[in-house]
Amino acid sequence: MSLVHINVMLAFIISLIGMLMYRSHLMSSLLCLEGMMLSLFTMMAITVLNINFTLASMTPIILLVFAACEAALGLSLLVLVSNTHGTDYVQNLNLLQC
């Protein structure tokens, strides 16, 4: 396993740990989720380039499109929650009240 693979996996693990530890604000959760998606994109692009599989060459771009859609939806939910509740604390959100 090369040093690049180890660094990308370490970036994913750090983002996952950040997602688990810093859950108090919605913005920090979205940033950690974005870091996870970016490391998945990098790992998938490296894997597709290494195996020279031409049919899977669009897979990293499709993942990047889904990551952009996820970021847009997350930011719109952040704006909606901060406008209605006045804060972005995850603990203040209750599914029965929203």
UniProtKB/Swiss-Prot annotation:
Highest taxon listed in the record's lineage: Eukaryota
EC numbers on record: 7.1.1.2
Matching Pfam families: Oxidored_q2
GO molecular function: NADH dehydrogenase (ubiquinone) activity
Uppermost EC category: translocase
Gene3D superfamilies linked: 1.10.287.3510
Cystines in this chain: none
Transmembrane stretches, start-end: 1-21, 29-49, 61-81
Phosphoprotein recorded as keyword: no
Bilayer disposition of the protein: Multi-pass membrane protein
GO terms classed as biological process: ATP synthesis coupled electron transport
Keywords from the UniProt entry: Electron transport, Membrane, Mitochondrion, Mitochondrion inner membrane, NAD, Respiratory chain, Translocase, Transmembrane, Transmembrane helix, Transport, Ubiquinone
Catalyzed reactions per annotation: a ubiquinone + NADH + 5 H(+)(in) = a ubiquinol + NAD(+) + 4 H(+)(out)
Biological role: Core subunit of the mitochondrial membrane respiratory chain NADH dehydrogenase (Complex I) which catalyzes electron transfer from NADH through the respiratory chain, using ubiquinone as an electron acceptor. Part of the enzyme membrane arm which is embedded in the lipid bilayer and involved in proton translocation.
Homology family: Belongs to the complex I subunit 4L family.
Oligomer and partners: Core subunit of respiratory chain NADH dehydrogenase (Complex I) which is composed of 45 different subunits.
Name of this chain's protein: NADH-ubiquinone oxidoreductase chain 4L
Organism field: Phataginus tetradactyla
